[in-house]
Amino acid sequence: MNLPWHPVLIHFPIALLMVGGGAALIWLATGRTFWRQAALALVFLGAIGAFAAKQTGEGLEKMVEERGGVNEALLHEHEESGEQTVIVAFLALAALGFAEYRARKGGPSGAKATDSIAIRAVAALLTVAAAGMVARTGHLGGTLTWGGLTEPAVGSDAGTTAPPAGDAPVSRDVDNDGD
């Protein structure tokens, strides 16, 4: 079985970065250690997942282009968005990692440092940006795979009608051109 890994892996960074964004916002509001560490763990896994999704997407892109019938502009936009998501996810990870390091090691005097609101704000902003970007990337990928809200994707069975009750013939004219 030659299963492309991209469709399998993509859901992990979407879930992890979106929940990580929520955890970062709660940390921003409360300053509680639990939420900082939760955001750090979620973004760590989400950034790795985003990188893996980007890498496997490269191979899938070649398969899709060989098959043809793909919207090249949308595919390119999805690819660019995925690359940007990886960058911002790792920037968010760095900011959260810095906050964790600072909280554990303390400030310049060696005393335990409290979470600075500025550090929390920057880390939360980057984490929420990564969550928004992964959502956009996922939306673009979903549009590539499943089509828009009103248009079926090329090669999909969307747009065909379900068999009616009784013996009436079923139309398989997907593009409504009469053939």
Question: Across the structure, where does each feature detected by a protein language model lie?
Answer:
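Polytopic transmembrane helical bundles with strong interfacial aromatic enrichment
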Residues: 1-179
